[in-house]
A protein has these predicted regions:
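Charge-rich, well-structured scaffold segments of protease-associated domains
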Residues: 1-124, 141, 167, 191-192, ...
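Generic non-transmembrane alpha-helix signal with a bias for helix starts/N-cap capping motifs
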Residues: 181-182, 267
Length: 330
């Protein structure tokens, strides 16, 4: 971000950082220390522990199996040569997407991009291949001294480029999409008082997609919370949603969409995201129409194909009573 009057100076500084970064020893050690401090903190965060364990089981030897921050050993071993090589692989014209918003014309932007990116190589290093989601139904318990257990659960999901993504999004809004009106919140929190919060979310990535959820509950009640979640997963898979739930979910999803466009930065990020996924240029104008077009039959069909109560894997971090690593409880 920069003011129009500072454009030339800002672009010159940014160009220097992109084309010829110094990777000075002091900068490398400063950032290395910051990353390693974060990694140490992660070892005491139940949510982070659960997430790393889930990804390791879900993605095996794929890069998605490891944290973006690396490990203590891998970060400690990084050299300046490693950073230079990674920069050469990543910063290339075939790896870049641009979104620009504000006081600039297309012609001016073209000149700016030539100045900023013109010296980059045409192609970068190889991209990771698509990942197979390998996690199977079951429970993994990671002992952690705390009065409350955290559970991250999920199975294979659905990609943003899948024609059934919109029905899946509506389905998730009903099931556990962050609203106090969701089925999971109603059944796990409101009716039984097992948690302060439970949610589910679609997690599509470039090379794989998962459908995940999160719940925290007292150690002596987490088993019951898991049983209720599995029941609701199965009910939605078998029955879909009701007409009222469909209407309310679509109203929420379409009504919340304009709130994403609340500044130049968010708009630019949306434009880049559209390009990365390969969405058409009219996506913003037509997106809510596609949500409104979702029918009860669409949601029921997708629920039956997507939701797999027996395929859910729960990673539980804490001291859960009555739960052990192994198959899902009967």
């Amino acid at each position: 971000k920069f003011l129009t009057e500072n454009r030339d100076e800002a672009v010159a500084l940014l160009r220097s950082s992109i084309i010829d970064p110094s990777f000075s020893a002091s900068d490398i050690e400063r950032v290395r220390g910051q990353v390693m401090t974060g990694l140490r903190s992660d070892t005491t965060d139940p949510d982070d522990i659960a997430g790393k364990a889930f990804n390791a089981m879900a993605f095996g030897g794929h890069p998605y199996a490891t944290s973006l921050s690396g490990t203590m050993d891998s970060v400690a071993a990084l050299t300046r040569a490693d950073l230079v090589a990674a920069h050469g692989d990543i910063f290339a014209k075939d790896r870049l997407y641009v979104g620009a918003v504000g006081d600039i014309t297309p012609t001016e932007l073209g000149v700016l991009l030539d100045q900023l990116l013109g010296e980059l190589p045409e192609t970068g290093g190889p991209q990771p291949k698509d990942a197979e989601v390998m996690i199977e139904g079951g429970v993994t318990v990671i002992e952690f001294e705390t009065p409350q257990s955290v559970a991250l659960f999920g199975h294979k999901g659905i990609g943003l480029d899948d024609p059934d993504y919109f029905p899946a999004n509506v389905l998730n809004q009903v099931l556990g999409g962050g609203s106090f009106e969701s089925r999971l919140m109603n059944e796990v929190r409101e009716k039984r008082g097992l948690t302060y919060g439970v949610s589910s979310f679609l997690l599509p990535r470039d090379h794989a997609a998962t459908y995940q959820g999160h719940v925290a509950s007292a150690n002596d009640r987490i088993g019951e919370a898991i049983a209720v979640i599995r029941d609701e997963w199965e009910k939605a898979s078998d029955q879909g949603v009701t007409p009222d739930e469909l209407r309310d979910a679509k109203t929420y999803i379409t009504g919340a969409y304009p709130l994403r466009f609340d500044g130049n930065g968010p708009i630019a990020r949306i434009m880049v995201g559209m390009q990365m996924i390969g969405l058409p240029i009219d996506y913003i104008a037509t997106r809510n129409d596609k949500v409104d077009a979702v029918t009860l039959d669409d949601v029921k069909r997708v629920a039956g194909e997507l939701l797999d109560a027996e395929g859910l894997h729960f990673v539980v971090v804490g001291k859960p009573e009555g739960l052990t690593t192994g198959p899902l409880p009967e």
